């Protein structure tokens, strides 16, 4: 679904584990890494899209995760000119995204990147909370920064709940 301004409706998914690390996936056959994301189909809500994309791209089901938060607003980024397909109608100039923060409640072995007949990702790993902001492709960086700032109050307490006390104790 592309709106009148040329933005495609899309959802983005940040998955966090018990250690406060986030799920980071490599695009199939490429060197670029990103969060799972995907377009909203006609008649779908953002939450329905999120669950569909979560299953298609990561192999996870609703019972494997818990919704912790979602962004208050749709966040936009423009595509670089080289990625805009002017021959398709309507022309898509970028994405507007609703983001979800999910807590993985199932075992990591539930992740199955090859679940789909057309996998989006070929590798994944857990990374520190802010790592993706520095590593994502440049045209998505501002949106990633906004998302991670908005989710920090929800995600970072989860990080510190499970971390062992690293302070040295004095006798």
Swiss-Prot record:
Q: Could you tell me the EC number(s) of this protein?
A: 3.6.1.-
The protein in question is named: RNA pyrophosphohydrolase
Enzyme type, top EC level: hydrolase
Would you tell me the Gene Ontology cellular component terms? Answer: cytoplasm
What is the purpose of this protein? Accelerates the degradation of transcripts by removing pyrophosphate from the 5'-end of triphosphorylated RNA, leading to a more labile monophosphorylated state that can stimulate subsequent ribonuclease cleavage.
- Write out the similarity annotation: Belongs to the Nudix hydrolase family. RppH subfamily.
Name of the coding gene: rppH
Swiss-Prot/TrEMBL GO biological process terms: mRNA catabolic process
Species lineage:
Bacteria, Pseudomonadati, Pseudomonadota, Gammaproteobacteria, Alteromonadales
Q: Which UniProt keywords apply?
A: Hydrolase
Cofactor(s) the protein requires to work: a divalent metal cation
A single Pfam family it belongs to is: NUDIX
Matching entries from InterPro entries are given as:
Nudix_hydrolase (IPR020476), NUDIX_hydrolase-like_dom_sf (IPR015797), NUDIX_hydrolase_CS (IPR020084), NUDIX_hydrolase_dom (IPR000086), RppH (IPR022927)
Entry's PROSITE patterns?
A: NUDIX (PS51462), NUDIX_BOX (PS00893)
Concerning HAMAP family, the annotation shows: Nudix_RppH
**Keyword Secreted set for record:** no
Motif Nudix box, residue range(s) on this chain: 38-59
Q: Which organism is it from?
A: Colwellia psychrerythraea (strain 34H / ATCC BAA-681) (Vibrio psychroerythus)
Report the GO molecular function annotations.
mRNA 5'-diphosphatase activity
Q: Which residues form the Nudix hydrolase domain?
A: 6-149
| Tree of life domain | Bacteria
Record-linked NCBIfam families: PRK00714.1-1, PRK00714.1-4, PRK00714.1-5
């Amino acid at each position: 679904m592309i709106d009148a301004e040329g933005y495609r409706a899309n959802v983005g998914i940040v998955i966090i584990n018990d250690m406060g690390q986030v799920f980071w996936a490599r695009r199939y056959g490429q060197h670029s890494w990103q969060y799972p994301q995907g377009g909203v189909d006609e008649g779908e809500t953002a939450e329905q899209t999120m669950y569909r994309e979560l299953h298609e791209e990561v192999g996870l089901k609703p019972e494997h995760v818990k919704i912790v938060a979602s962004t208050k607003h749709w966040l936009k980024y423009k595509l670089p000119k080289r990625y805009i397909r002017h021959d398709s109608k309507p022309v898509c100039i970028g994405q507007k995204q609703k983001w979800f923060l999910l807590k993985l409640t199932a075992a990591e072995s539930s992740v199955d990147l090859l679940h789909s007949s057309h996998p989006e990702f070929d590798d994944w790993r857990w990374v520190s909370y802010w790592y993706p902001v520095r590593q994502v492709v440049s045209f998505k960086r501002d949106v990633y920064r906004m998302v991670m700032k908005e989710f920090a109050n929800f995600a970072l307490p989860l990080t510190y709940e499970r971390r062992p006390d690293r302070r040295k104790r004095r006798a």
